[in-house]
């Protein structure tokens, strides 16, 4: 970049490329470096495959345990509250970190992506929680664009709803958070959302349609058994994610050592 500071499209000439000096270790050292980096890459790929398998296992267990033989109910029946987000852009605060405003961009594969999270100050938090103050165990659902994914809010953070989201609060006497989270992400419910979207210019789910989502309601005992299974899988997932993070840091360090 220092070679092309004033051009619109960054580029290097053939002369500049030919002038670049790169280290050239002995061939046996090159082979050793390649072997070490390949091993690190293989382990990273393995950890990612293991994470994908855990996701498949959770979905497979859900299909195995729950079926249409149970009473079919609406989301409105099993929830004490279903509320839409405020239809306004939050006033974000680059300093405050106490009040995360969760948007569709933070809802990825059923989990919260904290890397892109934005935050609001206390006054904006109060404004955006007038309808309902989110609590741990609530489900935040992406209702526009890449709609249909959702997350369970964890304890320890004062969330408010960002744009293009809605919140489901399960009635604890009827439905667990883990079951509702998984059923809202299931193919049958996604198909209902797709059907309600027919002809829409901008893909989205209306709150009236979301309240009418239909799905089986198994006994709480069975829901809790599934929840225990998911929690055990999550422990395994955390271990693998920690291993993956260490491997990625190690690979970057090796790249820096060999080529930096």
Annotated model-derived regions:
Residues 19-35, 46-86, 212-224, 231-260:
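Non-catalytic DNA-recognition/assembly elements of restriction-modification systems
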Residues 130-133, 158:
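Residue-level "contact hotspot" at macromolecular interaction interfaces
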Residues 4-28, 143, 159-166, 175-178, ...:
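A short glycine-rich beta-alpha junction/loop motif
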Residues 70-112, 125-129:
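Low-complexity, Lys/Gly-biased intrinsically disordered segments
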Residues 1-3, 108-120, 139-162, 178-182, ...:
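Short, ligand-facing micro-motifs at secondary-structure edges
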Residues 6, 127-128, 199, 238:
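Short, solvent-exposed loop/turn positions at domain surfaces
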Residues 54, 133-134:
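Short, well-ordered loop/turn sites that connect or cap secondary structure elements
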